Regions:
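Acidic, polar-rich low-complexity tracts and alpha-helical solenoid repeat scaffolds
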Residues: 1-119
Length: 119
């Protein structure tokens, strides 16, 4: 459904998963992919809420690093450099070996350059 841009149907399915399995891995995945769907539609506040749900409700889930990175990207796109850098720092510090950390390092450099925050 995601690849076919059938976002409304996919979001409905993810909502059903969250309702049926509110505390399990399925819910964390559903929140994460809901965030991705909202991002694809440029619905940043909805995406932020979805990624924050992963971070707040599932602190040990494998999607934490990706969710923190996505939150940083949302803040970057919205022009919130300080908040973006804070999220990137969390990813880099806590998930140094992850793919998200590598992406966060690149995004961090870009934000610092754009904000004249280069050390």
């Amino acid at each position: 459904l995601f690849e076919e841009s059938r976002y409304a149907e996919a979001l409905e399915l993810f909502t059903e998963i969250i309702i049926a399995f509110p505390f399990g891995d399925y819910a964390a995945e559903a929140y994460f992919w809901s965030g991705e769907l909202f991002l694809a539609q440029l619905k940043y506040e909805d995406a932020k809420l979805s990624f924050l749900s992963v971070v707040d409700q599932f602190p040990d889930h494998e999607r934490i690093s990706d969710s923190l990175y996505k939150l940083g990207e949302i803040e970057r796109v919205q022009g919130n450099a300080t908040e973006a850098l804070s999220y990137y720092s969390k990813v880099i510090t806590n998930f140094a070996e992850s793919g998200a950390a590598q992406l966060a390092k690149k995004s961090e450099e870009i934000v610092k350059e754009q904000s004249n925050l280069v050390e």
